[in-house]
């Protein structure tokens, strides 16, 4: 009976093991993740390569013409100091261009952590793994928009 109580003590005092992040790669050597932002949903595949990024079959510089959106897309790769080492293939649907760029960025960051679990702390510190939950506030009845009231007339 003493052996059993000793085992119970060990089981209750043992600290929970830290979650082990294992590399998740498919048969073609790609890591898959989904990214979301506003109404946009991106499906992202990352594999070792030369740094080529395609979005919906086009080069990312052709799909996202504005330099700000191109910069948003590259942020997780630059933060992880892995520019030119990964090929990214993404399909994105829904929302506008800004939301789509944010969704692809979120997906790239998640896929990088699946491909190389050691990058998780760097990307987490940069805030790339957190889903940006801000969405458009709904319109309320009795108002012109979500917060704007109809014009008030004293007389």
Curated annotation (Swiss-Prot):
Signal peptide: none annotated. One of its GO terms (biological process) is translation. The keyword Cytoplasm does not apply. One of its GO terms (molecular function) is RNA binding. It comes from the Bacteria. NCBIfam families: PRK00132.1. Belongs to the universal ribosomal protein uS9 family. This is Small ribosomal subunit protein uS9. It comes from Sinorhizobium fredii (strain NBRC 101917 / NGR234).
